[in-house]
């Protein structure tokens, strides 16, 4: 009987041990499930953080690229404007030489000894080349003589009364005006004729 009790108590111990093992195994699986859920939650959170970080970096990259493009465009525009200003300054300076050629030609027209000479023909040729050069670079003369006075392109040096006109018109040009493409390069210096005052 003693043996039976021993066997029974050993069986019970074995059953208890097995039950504990099963219980521990269940708890272990439960804990493992909780650990897996915690790991999954942590990984999802980390993925979300990395996605946000990636989106932020992408936005910063796009902003930097747009800023670089704006700087490139602004620099190109500033360079073009600088070249345009330099060209305008040079062409404006050359107009003085053009004026002097025209004065020389006008003086030669009044002197019959000079008019047919090789010297005069040379000045005419150089003047023509000068005009061609200016035209090739976008410079064009502003037609003024006989035109209605326009303060945007004409500078009135003096005004005189002229019969038989109803509006102010340019009656004499002292210095021609010029445009560079569509932009005013130099105003024409002119004498303006105004309608004669009515006599009482």
Curated annotation (Swiss-Prot):
It is found in: Cytoplasm. Its main location: cytoplasm. One of its GO terms (biological process) is protein folding. Keywords: Chaperone, Cytoplasm, Stress response. PANTHER family: GRPE PROTEIN, GRPE PROTEIN HOMOLOG, MITOCHONDRIAL. Participates actively in the response to hyperosmotic and heat shock by preventing the aggregation of stress-denatured proteins, in association with DnaK and GrpE. It is the nucleotide exchange factor for DnaK and may function as a thermosensor. Unfolded proteins bind initially to DnaJ; upon interaction with the DnaJ-bound protein, DnaK hydrolyzes its bound ATP, resulting in the formation of a stable complex. GrpE releases ADP from DnaK; ATP binding to DnaK triggers the release of the substrate protein, thus completing the reaction cycle. This is Protein GrpE. It comes from Brachyspira hyodysenteriae (strain ATCC 49526 / WA1).
């Amino acid at each position: 009987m003693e043996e039976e009790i021993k066997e029974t108590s050993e069986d019970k111990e074995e059953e208890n041990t097995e039950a504990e093992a099963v219980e521990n195994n269940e708890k272990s699986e439960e804990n493992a499930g909780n650990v897996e859920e915690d790991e999954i939650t942590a990984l999802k959170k980390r993925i979300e953080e990395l996605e946000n970080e990636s989106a932020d970096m992408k936005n910063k990259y796009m902003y930097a690229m747009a800023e670089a493009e704006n700087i490139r465009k602004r620099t190109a525009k500033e360079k073009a404007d600088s070249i345009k200003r330099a060209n305008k300054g040079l062409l404006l300076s050359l107009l003085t030489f053009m004026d002097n050629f025209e004065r020389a030609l006008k003086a030669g027209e009044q002197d019959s000894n000079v008019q047919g000479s090789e010297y005069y023909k040379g000045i005419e040729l150089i003047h023509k080349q000068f005009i061609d050069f200016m035209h090739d670079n976008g410079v064009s003369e502003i037609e003024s003589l006989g035109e209605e006075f326009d303060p945007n392109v004409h500078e009135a040096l003096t005004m005189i009364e002229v019969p038989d006109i109803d509006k102010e018109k340019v009656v004499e040009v002292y210095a021609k005006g010029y445009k560079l493409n569509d932009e005013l390069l130099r105003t024409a210096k002119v004498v303006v004729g105004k309608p004669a005052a009515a006599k009482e």
